[in-house]
Amino acid sequence: FSSRRRHTRCLSDWSSDVCSSDLKALADMDTKTSASHGKRTIRVEDDMLLRGKGRYVSDAPQPNQLQAYFVRSPHVCAKIKSVDISAALKIKGVVAVLTGKDMQEAGHGSLSQHPPVPGRNGGKLIMPFRPALAHDRVMHIGETVALVVAETLAAAQDGAEAVEVDYEQQDAVVDLRAAVEKGAPQLWPDAPGNIAVDWAGAHPKPEENEKEVDRVFASAKHVAKVSLVHNRLNVASMEPRGATASYDKANDSFHLRVCSQGARVMRDATAQIMKIGNDKIRVTTEEVGGAFGLKTGPYPEYIAILYAAKKTGRPVYWMSGRSEAFLSDNHARDSYSDVELALDEKGKFLALRIRHICAMGAYIGAVGANIGTYNMMRCLPGMYDIKLIDAQSKCVFTNTVVTAPYRGAGRPEASYCLERVVDEAARITGIDPIRLRRKNLISSKAFPYKTPIGTTYDSGDFATVLDKGLALADWDGFKARKKESKKRGLLRGIGVCAVLEHAGGAPIEGAQMTFPGGESLVLTLNVQSTGQSHATVFPRVVAERLGIKFETITHRHGDSAHEIAGYASVGSDRKSTRLNSSHLVISYAVFC
């Protein structure tokens, strides 16, 4: 059961623009809307999607477009001694073959783009250069080495098979914990010990805080300890990643049609990598077949096909295959936690200590270093009243696919760590797990509650949430169910996990309403729908607030040319921040 939606809308300074007062204002507005408020609305997207009329990347072929296929590394780590494309160019239908040398000559920047993450003693996040096509070394299996563009996909695949790459294999390390051991192969010379950043930013004075926590642990009656593995995973969305790149020679501009979580953020990042102005590239996204964090930022393939479109003068289309996606899509998780909880003789929580290491992969991915640092640690101490927390995290390079956000992005790891160590505390103290939790819940009278991490909970009633969860789960009836299962040779377990996470962390959001004439209204948002009913939810809010017909509203999204302020559909924040911005625009329209 989750208390997230009810109690944690304003848990950090990241989401201060959408706090409880804002949401109360929205709720007050809703009470004054039309009579249709609260009535069931059929999703306007459903008819189109169920009839197969949704437009995805593959549904918008461009005239005279070429097919792209990538040559990928079969090695975990290797030096590229040479790349011979002569045979590939002789394949019927092959138009061009690009290598890392071509991308170097194009002068593009690194795909590793990340906001600053401070380390210990003034250290900073190490971000090695990540090319669109590898030119001197490959750092993980599946890394892009060459791009073949041809008249057909079959010809492009034949051309890729004809590319000869001479590799010299090098020592590699793929295990997270092995990467930080003495003597492990070093991926990057400026990242000793394979440490991208040694983060202790959960406290403004980490050294003093660490000493205080150590003192409490040394005198604690009980210390519960658990070591936890957070397994690496791959997203496998229904629609794989894909894009079509076009180049307009007359205007020296690009158009990238791509399945993304936000056209504007994709446009801005891609322009920065290609070292062109934002006005020189347009990014559009229509329907998206699943994203979950996977499709937020640019990938090597997008930069490569954009350059190929310019070089060939023709649109270039690429769609990932399933096996290809497993080797090239951003992965997630792959981290390890040592967690300790200090308790007094009565079972009161005194201090929490976490030592966390998380794999970045071979490069730094889109906000990948935020996952095991800010995202994870700001969810502590969950619903528990813990006065002292020492949370430290090391981001580590390994010869694996880059990791990036996926469904929760660090927040589930925080809840897992908390609840596992609380259960261990119940075991070693002999206190009932539920009673131990009740004893240590943050009181409903303690709000606003500032955590040792520095975030503030604006409200909450965790005891009530716990009671409701136990009732819904029929906790008291578990023993009987377990006994019945045992008779049938089955195992049955039960547990408690309260997920309390900060959300709504995108930096800025906006909305625009235009009135072209008559009763029609055009609502333009930067937000990208990936299955969240945006075309239904946002127009309905506007219709109810303005007292107009829902059918008269046209909803626009997924086009960087609209120039609406905003980020992308990330961080569980779209409904809250977009509804907030929509209400503000509505208020402006009403009062002006």
Which functions belong to the PLM regions below?
Residues 70-104, 147-167, 243-312, 369-379, ...:
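Alpha-helical support elements that line or immediately flank enzyme active sites
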Residues 1-22, 579-592:
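Single conserved hydrophobic/aromatic residue that forms the stacking wall/gate
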Residues 21-198, 223-226:
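Flexible, low-hydrophobicity surface segments
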Residues 98-143, 177-189, 265, 283-304, ...:
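Short, surface-exposed loop/turn segments at secondary-structure boundaries that line and modulate
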Residues 45-48, 114-128, 198-243, 334-420, ...:
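Glycine-rich loop/linker segments at domain edges
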Residues 100, 279-286, 313-323, 350-355, ...:
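Beta-strand segments within the central parallel beta-sheet cores of soluble alpha/beta enzyme folds
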Residues 151-152, 310-361, 578, 582, ...:
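Phosphate/diphosphate-binding loops
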